[in-house]
UniProtKB/Swiss-Prot annotation:
The gene is tuf. Monomer. This is Elongation factor Tu. Mg(2+) binds at residue 26. GO terms for cellular component: cytosol. Residues 62-66 are annotated as: G2. Belongs to the TRAFAC class translation factor GTPase superfamily. Classic translation factor GTPase family. EF-Tu/EF-1A subfamily. One of its GO terms (molecular function) is GTP binding.
């Protein structure tokens, strides 16, 4: 019986519930768990509301987040589902990338329509690159007037379009999480319909191995008679031996060829995402490369110094700063394997940022880093983390 849990013969996706406080995110999560456990009992185990709501505290890079993880399967897919009960938890989770989502269910109470946090969550989802949103119009059993439901649906679609999602075509499913939990047949079906919409509409994620190769350099050393070796953990892609690569970041871009690949002291024909490996680089000296650069497929990533970011600043209790900072604050930005100093400019109208706040900012680094939108980083002072963020837009 239990064996079915570990059969990974279905595509795996990470999804989550987002939306305004008390619109029913956690109740919907519990309802999905129950409905699927009833429908496919062999592969699903029901998790009740209490277990999800009392989400354990997790530490991600020193930031405390309450977040619940549950898993379930439909006929087509295996899902890992994250539910962050509190608004602050959700914001931290999105910005720190504690749980990357392939798609999200935006929960909007039909009784209220979109509220302040609904907007903020959708904006954040776009900024951190959640690829797909669909909508659960929850508490639909409490609205008798069909026209009112249509109106709320229109409002939600408009909000999605405003934030750069496909509001016209996003599925909007009318559900009642509470009634589904109580076993009311009409509303159980609504949750089944919702999961069918998730199955059909959230695209399969691009597997890491299918992306262009990238390995952050952690260490550099010389093997006498053979040349310079860089080591690190391949972040994505595959790299066959004798491929051309670029070394990007910190210094001008260099081109070279990988003439040897080693893992656990064995010679390999290719390096793959997720593996720790050593790459032998043709014609480069020990001093030509350093920690903090990346080895990548030529042309796949470029070095940049100026960017916009969305950042969460740790509270004092989380070990962060004790006092606010202002524009021109110069901390270290830790990208992948190295710290680079950067100058912060706060947005117009933001005088200062307090510990525990989340904010947008513009950053100018003193050295270029291999960068793309969505890349995560930590903000550090003297080696301790005081914030965590993501690149939302590259300026130069």
């Amino acid at each position: 019986m239990a064996k079915a849990k570990f059969e990974r013969n279905k595509p795996h996706l990470n999804i989550g519930t987002i939306g305004h406080v008390d619109h029913g995110k956690t109740t919907l999560t519990a309802a999905i768990s129950k409905v699927l456990a009833d429908k496919y009992p062999d592969v699903n185990e029901q998790r009740d509301f209490g277990a999800i709501d009392s989400a354990p505290e997790e530490k991600q890079r020193g930031i405390t987040i309450n977040i619940a993880h549950i898993e379930y399967q439909t006929d087509k897919r295996h899902y890992a589902h994250v539910d962050a009960p509190g608004h602050a938890d959700y914001v931290k989770n999105m910005i720190t990338g504690a749980a990357q989502m392939d798609g999200a269910i935006l929960v909007v109470a039909a009784t209220d329509g979109p509220m302040a946090q609904t907007r903020e969550h959708v904006l954040l989802a776009r900024q951190v690159g959640v690829p797909y949103l669909l909508v659960a119009l929850n508490k639909s059993d409490m609205v008798d007037d069909e026209e009112l439901l249509d109106l709320v649906e229109m409002e939600v679609r408009e909000l999605l379009s405003d934030q750069g999602f496909d509001g016209d075509n996003a599925p909007v499913v009318r559900v009642s999480a509470l009634k589904a939990l109580e076993g009311d047949a009409q509303w159980v079906k609504s949750v089944e319909d919702l999961m069918e919409a998730v199955d059909e509409n959230v695209p399969d994620p691009v597997r890491d191995t299918d992306k262009p190769f990238l390995m952050p350099i952690e260490d550099v050393f010389t093997i006498t008679g053979r040349g310079t070796v860089v080591t690190g953990r391949a972040e994505r892609g595959t790299l066959p031996i004798n491929s051309e690569v670029e070394i990007v970041g910190i210094r001008p871009v260099q081109k070279t060829t990988v003439t040897g690949i080693e893992m656990f002291h064995k010679q390999m024909d290719e390096a793959m995402a997720g593996e720790n490996c050593g790459l032998l680089l043709r014609g480069l000296k020990r001093d030509d490369v350093e920690r903090g650069q990346v080895v990548c497929k030529p042309g796949s990533i470029t070095p940049h110094t100026d960017f916009e970011a969305n950042v969460y600043i740790l509270s004092k209790e989380e070990g962060g700063r004790h006092n606010p900072f202002y524009s021109n604050y110069r901390p270290q930005f830790y990208f992948r394997t190295t710290d680079v100093t950067g100058v912060i400019t706060l947005p117009e109208g933001t005088e200062m940022v307090m510990p525990g706040d989340n904010t947008e900012m513009t950053v100018e680094l003193i050295q270029p880093i291999a960068m793309e939108e969505g890349l995560g980083f930590a903000i550090r002072e003297g080696g301790r983390t005081v914030g965590s963020g993501r690149v939302t837009k590259i300026i130069k």
